[in-house]
């Protein structure tokens, strides 16, 4: 089964919440379990203001890997971010990592990157050099 959906969410955590919230409260735990068992990938993207005046695309990729189903089932967003960082070589990436790449290559400003970051406290530590 192939399911492709376009949802009004900006990252994997909001996507998981959005899907879960479609179900009645009493059914959400079961919905999370089904989602955890079936999800193969969640791709998110957002457009950032580019220093050149246009837009720069920022991507987030969550792929099925060891630990992902359990973290989804338990709604453990921090664990999912750690998994994404650990599996970067396999193509996963957090939104904040993509923002750091765009900033490091001069495609977006530090203020734009910070405004779009999902973990502002952690991102602020990265911005010290900018």
Where are these regions (language model features)?
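Short, flexible helix-loop junctions that flank or precede catalytic/ligand sites
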Residues: 1-130
């Amino acid at each position: 089964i192939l399911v492709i959906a376009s949802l009004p969410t900006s990252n994997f955590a909001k996507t998981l919440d959005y899907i879960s919230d479609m179900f009645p409260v009493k059914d959400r735990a079961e919905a999370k379990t089904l989602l955890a068992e079936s999800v193969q990938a969640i791709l998110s993207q957002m457009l950032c203001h580019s220093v050149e005046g246009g837009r720069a695309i920022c991507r987030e990729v969550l792929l099925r890997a060891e630990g992902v189903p359990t973290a989804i089932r338990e709604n453990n967003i921090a664990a999912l971010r750690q998994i994404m960082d650990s599996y970067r070589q396999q193509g996963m990436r957090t939104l904040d990592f993509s923002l750091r790449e765009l900033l490091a290559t001069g495609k977006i400003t530090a203020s734009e990157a910070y405004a779009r970051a999902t973990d502002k406290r952690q991102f602020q530590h990265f911005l010290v050099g900018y």
